[in-house]
Amino acid sequence: MADGRASSAQSGENLLFLTDEQLRQGIEAMFFAYRGFTADPDRILSDMAYGRAHHRAVHFINRAPGTTVNNLLNILGVTKQSLNRVLRTLIEDGLVESKVGKADKRERHLFLTEEGHALEQKLSDAQRVRMRMAYREAGPDAVAGFRRVLEAMMDREMRNAYGRLKDSGT
């Protein structure tokens, strides 16, 4: 029994205080995990001369069809100029459609086209495969703990935006 508790403590379970070395290892693990998480979509996007900004835009337009450019700016945390460059290419390539708002003609609402949905599906399928494998290997308790850690790392505004997106059920 004592051995089980020692190995649990070493793995980070039930620790209230982490050493700088344990924190550094967590930071490095996130860097490498992020590289793995983005590697598959990066390969798909590179064939189209797109980058991660295109991926994020397509992802969040898919999650909230009809979202406004301003809402997407808030979610992505990028400059208007940067987002406009990305949206221009996605619209020109027939992946995103921009419609003028009915209530406010100054607003532009964004929707994925059929081709945009196909790209989003391909990108998210690649990431779901990786996430599913990792979650299965880690187990349900680790999955719940991982999600809590990620949510705890978000600033309040980000956590609120994430909560709204999560609660939208799309």
Give the location of each predicted region.
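Flexible interhelical turns and helix-capping residues at alpha-helix boundaries
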Residues: 34, 65, 76, 80, ...
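N-terminal helix-turn-helix DNA-binding core of bacterial DNA-binding proteins
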Residues: 39-82, 93
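Charged, amphipathic alpha-helical coiled-coil/dimerization segments
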Residues: 2-14, 38, 88-151
